[in-house]
């Protein structure tokens, strides 16, 4: 019994030492984890700050977000058909992201995504005997036809960009149907009420693009 009592303090001390050592190791691991998360958070904040300043940089935006390829051609036909230059660029960005060879699943072609039947109709209206469907991939012809069509729609809808853009995307027939069904007049501006989700998003995107183009290309 005495031997057992003599041994107890020693066992207790060893147990206490072991407990303290484990506690110390846990503290070290906890501190390491905290240090790791602090470093990670700092890195995220630094990257977020850099990203913000890069994305706000106008040169970066012009080059990567809101380019103005074919600017001379856009300006020429926009002036010729009395359409806002930046509106034409905004439509091209939304339609094809300035890819000359873009083709939609529905068959729309080129920079301004003109359907073959629409292209043929435009050719008749402007008396262009040189039209062929393959030429819709030609930069000059595509921008010429698309800009003329925008001008035609803006005239038809009395300068209302929302209705003209909705017609460019969904067809003028649908727009007239919506105007009658929902009692829209020629002053309609609330694109959020457009019933087709694709057209609603399209009009929103083009108008947002135009705001950026107006800011970047004054």
Protein language model annotation of sequence segments:
Residues 1-35:
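N-terminal Lys/Arg-rich, disordered targeting/topogenic segments
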Residues 2-5, 14, 46, 50, ...:
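Generic secretory/membrane-interface signal
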Residues 5-7, 18, 39, 57, ...:
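Intrinsic disorder/low-complexity segments enriched in polar/charged and small flexible residues
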Residues 38-56:
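Hydrophobic membrane-insertion alpha-helices, especially the h-region
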Residues 53-218:
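Catalytic glycan-binding domains that act on GlcNAc-containing polysaccharides
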